[in-house]
Curated annotation (Swiss-Prot):
Monomer. This is Cardiolipin-specific deacylase 1, mitochondrial. Residues 20-41 are annotated as: Disordered. Pfam families: Abhydrolase_1 (PF00561). Residues 142-430 form the AB hydrolase-1 domain. GO terms for molecular function: carboxylic ester hydrolase activity; lysophosphatidic acid acyltransferase activity; phospholipase A2 activity. It catalyses: a cardiolipin + H2O = 1'-[1,2-diacyl-sn-glycero-3-phospho],3'-[1-acyl-sn-glycero-3-phospho]-glycerol + a fatty acid + H(+). GO terms for cellular component: mitochondrial inner membrane; mitochondrion. Changing W170R: Loss of function. Induction: Expressed in aerobic conditions and under genotoxic stress. Expression is increased during respiratory growth and regulated by the heme activator protein transcriptional activation complex. The gene is CLD1. Keywords: Hydrolase, Membrane, Mitochondrion, Mitochondrion inner membrane, Transferase, Transit peptide.
Length: 445
């Protein structure tokens, strides 16, 4: 049983603990001021990326001290602090920003909980506003951040810090998806394969739409941009389908989107041969929602130490510089531990949306961007931007095909950009370029 549980830590995640070879994990190349984002034409065919592959169990055991670097005493303290006040882990991270909780000269920010269903469940939001707006409230523009699988709004900390509010006309909203982060975590009402994916999607979409409505973002949808990452991109593309007659935003930016297309080997035997299906027990764990988060919750005092197997490699090389950045790294690790340790809920969407190994059960290309279904989004009047890291394991070729479909069949604006020196978490790996892209998109609204 322990062997099976430990092996669940190496399932091929969208964002989970990457004790993996070839994954977007530890040492992303440093940013270069001379590098530039790259537009990709729809005629280009790029290397088909491979999903992360697992390290053998024996190697994991041998490398335990280096794989989980959090000191034991710190891990125990994190557990005790979580029991005492789990909400403090979020505020501790956000307090590393220069405008929270005390406003700066130009920005103010606050945490907001918006009730989104009859059971009293809420969506957690971090809202950044200009201290003095230059336009009437109704004319403010809005940028909404939506995270991916297993993540939370705190992972956008480097974007919050640097993205300008452009003439004090913009508000930034970062939300935790229903059942994620510090949003309420009700018992997930679905079970795979008993329930179908469309019911699960509706559960998310209706609550997200209620949040848009209650936050008065539906009054002027032409002033809204949504930036969604990974599995959040998958959800928000399908959200457009559900509310196509009354869209909630003008532009959708899909950051390393999950579930766009099925695996494409470019018809080469070598690529087909390299890909091996996961073993049957691996698939069973995936379908039963046995994840690294299960380990974090069940191992109690060791949960933060287990979390460090992902967080130290993901964040440390980016944030660990001067003392202030080291303080932020510590807060970011503890934040990651807290959201991984909270009750499982929204994360169980994963087994409905994706097969073990990252293949979509129903791809966006099949559901939305098929020639036989060209009328699904034709009235959405939404602009699209597809962002991929140059070392991303999400397949840019699917984004290229879909972008071409949007432009040629639906006559909608769509573009694909590859961000240099970044992987799946490009919003963090190369946040300067990423923030610059978002700022340029904001200027177009």
């Amino acid at each position: 049983m322990f062997k099976s549980t430990l092996n669940s830590i190496i399932r091929r995640p969208l964002k989970g603990f990457q004790l993996l070879r070839g994954a977007d994990s530890s040492n992303t190349r440093p940013q270069s001021p001379r590098a530039s984002a790259r537009d990709v034409t729809e005629k280009q065919i790029l290397r088909t990326p491979s999903a992360p592959t697992a390290i053998p169990l024996r190697e994991i055991i041998y490398r335990v001290p280096s794989l989980f670097p959090r000191p034991l005493e710190d891990s125990v303290k994190d557990f005790r602090d979580f029991i005492k006040n789990e909400d403090a882990f979020q505020t501790e991270l956000l307090k590393t920003l220069p405008f929270y909780p005390t406003p700066s000269e130009s920005k103010t920010a606050r945490l907001i909980r918006t009730v989104v269903d009859d059971e009293g469940n809420y969506i957690n939001e971090f809202c950044i506003r200009p201290r003095k707006t230059s336009v009437p409230e109704a004319d403010l523009k809005h940028l909404v951040f939506i995270h991916g699988y297993g993540a939370g709004l705190g992972f956008f900390i480097k974007n919050f810090e640097d993205i300008p509010l452009l003439d004090n006309e913009w508000c930034i909203h970062a939300i935790d998806l229903p059942g994620y982060g510090f949003s309420s975590r009700p018992k997930f009402p679905f079970e795979y394969p008993r329930d179908n994916i469309h019911s699960v999607q509706d559960w998310f979409h209706e609550r997200i739409h209620t949040w848009f409505s209650k936050r008065n973002l539906l009054n002027r949808p032409e002033k809204n941009i949504v930036m969604a990452h990974s599995l959040g991109s998958y959800l928000m593309a399908l959200y457009l389908q559900k509310y196509k007659e009354s869209p909630s935003f003008k532009k959708l930016i899909l950051c390393s989107p999950a579930g766009v297309s099925y695996r494409d080997f470019n018809n080469t035997a070598s690529e087909v041969e390299k890909w091996k299906p996961p073993p049957w027990w691996y698939v069973k764990l995936w379908d039963r929602n046995i994840s690294p988060f299960t380990l974090v919750r069940n191992f109690r005092q060791l949960g933060s130490k287990i979390t460090s197997g992902w967080s130290y490699r993901r964040f440390k090389h980016i944030l660990n510089g001067d003392p202030e950045q080291s303080k932020r790294f510590e807060a970011l690790h503890r934040y990651a531990y807290a959201i991984f340790n909270k009750r499982g809920s929204g994360e169980y969407l994963l087994s409905f949306a994706l097969k073990c190994g990252g293949e979509p059960r129903l791809s966006l290309e099949q559901q939305l961007f098929d020639g036989k279904k060209s009328d699904i989004l034709k009235n959405s009047n939404c602009d699209w931007l597809w962002l991929y890291g140059d070392d991303d394991w999400m397949d840019v070729n699917g984004g290229l095909r879909v972008s071409r479909f949007l432009k040629e069949k639906l006559k909608q604006k769509s573009n694909v950009i590859i961000v240099p020196h970044s992987g799946h978490h490009l919003y963090l790996d190369n946040y300067k370029f990423f923030n610059n892209i978002l700022t340029k998109e904001m200027q177009k609204i």
